[in-house]
Regions:
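Amphipathic coiled-coil/heptad-repeat helices and related helical stalk/stem segments
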Residues: 15-18, 106-107, 136
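Conserved beta-strand termini and adjacent loop/short-helix elements that scaffold enzyme active sites
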Residues: 35-37, 98-102, 155
Length: 156
């Protein structure tokens, strides 16, 4: 029976491992959606207010250029992931790339997308520092604990 697989990813090596896992371990009959949630910085980059902190105002152009570069890296990673799945036998028409701006939060947005008829969420374990993970938690941890009525597979 074919499944709908949601691969939550960014441009990290850990995320790409989840794509490799699906390519090796799941039937090519399945439908795969490569899903990414981007932080929506457009409003911040277009902000023209005298109340902006002078330090931020002076760095705004550099910040927005970095955000544009991040968007390019994510797009390239998603295309590379699709190519890997197609080379593993998945039909190109059964591998979709879906990039959305953050709505409620990255983990909550992944869980909201998962409610659209997916059978499993696959994602990489995020390699963040122990201290940062202690205070903020990782996206994969939040998805794992927040998932209801759907399996979550975390690639290491």
């Amino acid at each position: 029976m074919a499944q709908r697989i949601l691969i939550a990813m960014d441009d990290s090596e850990n995320a790409f491992r989840s794509v490799e896992l699906v390519a090796k371990s799941f039937s090519a009959d399945n439908t795969v959606v490569l899903y990414n949630v981007l932080l929506d910085t457009a409003a911040l980059c277009n902000m023209e207010s005298p109340e902006l902190i002078p330090l931020f105002k002076s760095q705004q152009t550099s910040f927005c250029a970095l955000e544009d570069k991040k968007r390019e890296l994510v797009t390239a990673a998603m295309k590379r992931a699709k190519e890997l799945l197609v080379s593993a036998g998945f039909s190109e028409r059964k591998v979709e790339i879906k990039v959305e701006n953050k709505n409620k939060g990255v983990a909550r947005d992944i869980l909201a997308e998962a409610e659209n008829g997916y059978d499993i969420i696959v994602m990489g374990r995020r390699g963040i520092s122990g201290l940062k993970e202690f205070f903020l938690g990782s996206i994969s941890q939040k998805v794992f604990t927040g998932a209801r009525d759907i399996s979550v597979l975390i690639a290491n």
